[in-house]
């Protein structure tokens, strides 16, 4: 079975006032121990840069031996019907390599899936978790590209109340 085919245990669902699914949580097997010790949030997507951020966080977690890794994946807003049908599928596909990396290292994790502005949702989740810090990959944009397209890592770095590690 490939990592993309492995469906982790659903740990929670969140709906907005209109009943639209807006967030999901999944646990590794075995799940993170409770309470979380030294939680770190790692932003994940399907990119190689995102995977490098996960690999860096995994190495740090293994070295610390007491670090809880929370993966967060943010999707753009979807309609109510699309969210119910596709949110989990999209997020599990986009995070498959990240989850497989942590599983191979023997590190438990929790995957948080949300819809909305990526930087905003990453920071909101980090604050909610009382994360020690955030690890995020850089897309490697130059100055002009960053101005034109925006940079999630740049926005997180400047708005986060906790330390942010940007992995190139």
What are these regions (language model features)?
Residues 136-158:
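Glycine-rich, Arg-bearing micro-motifs that act as flexible, cationic patches
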Residues 84-96:
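Short, surface-exposed alpha-helical segments at coil->helix boundaries
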Residues 30-85:
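Small/aliphatic-rich secondary-structure junction motif
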Residues 162-168:
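Short, flexible loop segments at boundaries between secondary-structure elements
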Residues 70-72, 110-114, 165:
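General small-molecule cofactor/ligand-binding pocket signal
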Residues 1-35, 103-134:
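Structural beta-alpha unit
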Residues 73, 138-139, 168:
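Short secondary-structure boundary segments
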């Amino acid at each position: 079975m490939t990592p993309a085919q492995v469906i982790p245990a659903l740990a929670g669902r969140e709906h907005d006032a209109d009943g639209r699914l807006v967030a999901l949580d999944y646990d590794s097997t075995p799940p993170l121990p409770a309470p979380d010790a030294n939680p770190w949030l790692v932003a994940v997507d399907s990119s190689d840069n995102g995977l490098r951020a996960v690999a860096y966080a995994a190495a740090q977690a293994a070295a610390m031996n007491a670090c809880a890794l929370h993966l967060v994946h943010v999707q753009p807003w979807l309609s109510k019907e699309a969210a119910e049908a596709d949110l989990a599928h999209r997020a599990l596909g986009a995070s498959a390599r990240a989850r497989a990396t942590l599983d191979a290292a023997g590190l438990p994790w929790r995957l948080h899936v949300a819809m909305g502005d990526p930087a905003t949702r990453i920071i909101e989740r980090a604050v909610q978790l009382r994360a020690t810090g955030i690890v995020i990959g850089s897309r490697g944009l130059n100055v002009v590209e960053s101005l034109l397209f925006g940079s999630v890592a740049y926005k997180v770095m400047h708005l986060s109340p906790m330390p942010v590690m940007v992995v190139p």
